[in-house]
From Swiss-Prot:
Localization (cell): Sarcoplasmic reticulum membrane; Endoplasmic reticulum membrane
Domain of life: Eukaryota
Protein name, UniProt field: Sarcolipin
Family stated for the protein in its record: Belongs to the sarcolipin family.
Record field: transmembrane: 8-26
UniProt keywords, alphabetically: Endoplasmic reticulum, Membrane, Sarcoplasmic reticulum, Transmembrane, Transmembrane helix
General function of this protein: Reversibly inhibits the activity of ATP2A1/SERCA1 and ATP2A2/SERCA2 in sarcoplasmic reticulum by decreasing the apparent affinity of the ATPase for Ca(2+). Also inhibits the activity of ATP2A3/SERCA3. Modulates calcium re-uptake during muscle relaxation and plays an important role in calcium homeostasis in muscle. Required for muscle-based, non-shivering thermogenesis.
Tissue expression per record: Skeletal muscle (at protein level).
Taxonomic classification: Eukaryota, Metazoa, Chordata, Craniata, Vertebrata
Quaternary assembly: Homooligomer. Can also form heterooligomers with other sarcoplasmic/endoplasmic reticulum calcium ATPase (SERCA) regulators ARLN, ERLN, PLN and STRIT1/DWORF. Monomer. Interacts with calcium ATPase ATP2A1/SERCA1. Interacts as a monomer with ATP2A2/SERCA2; the interaction decreases ATP2A2 Ca(2+) affinity. Interacts with VMP1; VMP1 competes with PLN and SLN to prevent them from forming an inhibitory complex with ATP2A2.
Membrane topology recorded in Swiss-Prot or TrEMBL: Single-pass membrane protein
Length: 31
C-alpha cells in the first residue's frame, strides 16, 4: 500500500510539474 501511494504521489507530482512547465512555455510563447 505504501509503495503504491508513494508511486501515485510521485507520478502526480511529475505530471503537475510537467503541466506547469508547458503552461509557462505556452504563456511565454504567446507573450
Amino acid at each position: 500500500m505504501e509503495r503504491s501511494t508513494r508511486e501515485l504521489c510521485l507520478n502526480f507530482t511529475v505530471v503537475l510539474i510537467t503541466v506547469i512547465l508547458i503552461w509557462l512555455l505556452v504563456r511565454s510563447y504567446q507573450y
